[in-house]
Design a protein with these regions (language model features):
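N-terminal basic/disordered segments at the start of proteins
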Residues: 1-71, 179-180, 191, 294-310
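Small-residue-enriched alpha-helical segments and adjacent helix-cap loops
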Residues: 2-4, 29-33, 55-198, 228, ...
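Mobile "lid/hinge" segments at catalytic clefts and subdomain interfaces of large enzymes
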Residues: 2-4, 8, 166-265, 433-496
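Short amphipathic beta-strand starts and helix->beta connectors
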Residues: 41-47, 73-84, 203, 235-238, ...
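Short, flexible, solvent-exposed loop/turn segments with mixed acidic/basic and small polar residues
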Residues: 46-52, 83-89, 239-244, 301-307, ...
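Flexible, glycine/charged-enriched surface loops at secondary-structure junctions
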Residues: 85-89, 160-167, 238-255, 262, ...
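Terminal amphipathic helices with adjacent charged low-complexity linkers/tails
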Residues: 99, 103-107, 111-116, 238-302, ...
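Long hydrophobic segments that form regular secondary structure
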Residues: 304-311, 318-344, 484-486, 490-493, ...
């Protein structure tokens, strides 16, 4: 008996569910279902109504952020057929289509199935898109390619998603052992590849309200046993998660109710019980990349792969907003390049991998409209102009900040990548950023509260050294670009990059921020 997968029966049921959801979305459009009730249904299908309830978002689940040529071609066709205005690369390595009509959402869900895109469980109290280091399989220095485990875990979780009822969502990430951009240190489950072929596992971490660093649950977890540990977490979460208070329903709150040591004990006990089901044992071998290349390339966006002669190209559309024309352009170009594929990264960067030097040069030309500095790779959630939950329009703020920094001629490196969230949910990961912003309001003397952002300083997601930043005040939204410009000017005047300057002279950093809070 093999590992449970999304077999034909599962897919047939999924198609039937899409038909039922089509009726639901149209009932909502006709005012027959309240917004809150609709959200509880639509999230399970990876779709939400936007702030303008006539428009909808659909989240395309991409295990490990992997965009195969078939998936890229499907999306390129879909944006043309349905006139999709824009797409959003997400911090969970998915791609969202926005401003869709009630007719378009179920139609795209159905059309996505043949290329392996399943939107089921893309929202709501479900296992979310499983993340993997975006350059896994090609990154120099990695322990091993973790993509097969991310994909196997996705198959398993989707196969059982109808049979489990968790208190809230579950986020799982796999790190290849080079960097921790997927935030394994503070996920519900974070697997870190080790040089001996095992995984280190952290559990019950998370950003947002009541944030917690994950607790170490296993030092050398056999790779073949990954699904037993996932099953053990689901059992533990269902046993001890909070079904009464959604604000305290994520796995991280089990650290409070049970305590870290007891949580670890209960979890490992449930893992041991799960091992009675021998069908969950994995036997995976990463696919070998046989493509070779010649020539060299020197460009800050071109990354040499561990395969000699091959490169990955980084493309970061500002704010992670991808225009449909660019998607179509990339599909047309990459369809002529054998062996390449795309990867969505948690910082909203799109990597195009397995390129020769000449192919990489062509991709660099096609993506020249993206971020040109570290600061321009800053992360912002979709923001309050679209998101129902949002408090501030993080996308607008980022666009204004990028423009201000460009006009001030701040040199590359003087400012770090910043992360901007429109609310407390930390969708941008602002709590783990060198500089993070969280949407809020701030009192105005003698007036009404004004749009503002809480400032987080000093966070890091560095592998083995991850920690969360400190809140140091609140800046009015209209002054946020000026604050960043002044910080960048100070670092540049010192002749240092942000990391060096902020570490060497924290008093100077704080004195500048103090003028704005």
């Amino acid at each position: 008996m093999g590992v449970p997968t999304m077999d034909q029966q599962w897919l047939n049921t999924y198609r039937e569910e899409i038909g039922g959801f089509s009726n639901t979305i149209h009932s909502f459009a006709q005012g027959e279902i309240a917004r809150k009730d609709y959200k509880g249904i639509s999230g399970g299908f990876g779709s939400y109504a936007q702030r303008d309830a006539a428009k909808h978002m659909l989240r395309l689940r991409l295990p490990g952020g992997r965009v195969t040529p078939e998936r890229l071609h499907f999306m390129a066709q879909a944006v043309q057929q349905y006139h999709v205005p824009f797409l959003k690369l997400t911090t969970c390595e998915a791609i969202q289509m926005h401003d869709l009509t009630p007719d378009e959402v179920p139609a795209i869900m159905e059309a996505a199935i043949p290329c392996g895109i399943i939107t089921r469980g893309g929202g709501g109290d479900n296992p979310r898109n499983i993340q993997a280091s975006p350059l896994t399989g090609v990154q120099p220095g990695e322990a091993f390619d973790v993509m097969p485990w991310a994909e196997a875990a996705t198959e398993y979780l989707l196969s059982i998603c109808r049979d489990i009822h968790m208190p809230r969502k579950l986020k799982v990430a796999f790190c290849n052992g080079v960097d921790d951009c997927v935030h394994t240190a503070f996920r519900d489950m974070g697997f870190v590849a080790q040089p001996d072929g095992t995984f280190k596992l952290y559990i019950a971490g998370g950003l947002g309200g009541g944030w917690r660093m994950g607790i170490l649950a296993a030092e050398s977890l056999p790779a073949e046993d990954v699904l037993y540990y996932i099953r053990g977490m689901i059992t533990t979460f269902c046993q001890h998660g909070n079904y009464q208070n959604r604000a305290k329903a994520r796995t991280r709150f089990m650290q409070e109710t049970l305590g870290p040591d007891e949580l670890r004990r209960v979890f490992l006990e449930n893992v041991a019980a799960a091992k009675a089901d021998e069908s969950l044992k994995l036997h995976l071998t990463p696919a070998a990349i046989t493509k070779t290349g010649t020539g060299t390339l020197d460009d800050p966006r071109a990354i040499a792969q561990k395969q000699p002669g091959l490169y990955a190209v980084a493309y970061h559309p500002i704010g992670g907003r991808l225009i449909p024309e660019k998607l179509v352009q990339l599909d047309n170009l990459l369809s002529t390049i054998p062996g390449c594929e795309c990867r969505v990264a948690p910082n909203e960067t799109l990597y195009i991998i397995n390129l020769t030097a000449d192919e990489a040069a062509a991709v660099l030309d096609a993506t020249a409209d993206g971020a040109k500095t570290l600061f321009e790779t800053s992360v912002a959630c979709i923001g309050a102009s679209i998101c129902q939950q949002g408090v501030r329009d993080s996308q607008s703020v980022l666009q204004r900040a990028v423009q201000a920094v460009r006009e001030a001629n701040i040199p590359d490196g003087a400012l770090p990548k910043v992360c901007i969230s429109g609310c407390t949910s930390s969708c941008s990961g602002h709590q783990a950023a060198a500089i993070g912003f969280q949407g809020t309001v701030k009192a105005v003397p003698g007036g009404k509260p004004a749009p503002a952002f809480a400032i987080f300083l000093g966070g890091s997601d560095a592998l083995g050294h991850a920690h969360l930043g400190d809140t140091i005040g609140t800046v009015y939204e209209e002054q946020l670009p000026a604050l960043l410009v002044e910080l960048g000017q100070a670092a540049a005047a010192a002749g240092q990059n942000w990391q060096t300057w902020s570490a060497a002279d924290p008093d100077a950093v704080n004195s500048i921020i103090a003028k704005y809070v």
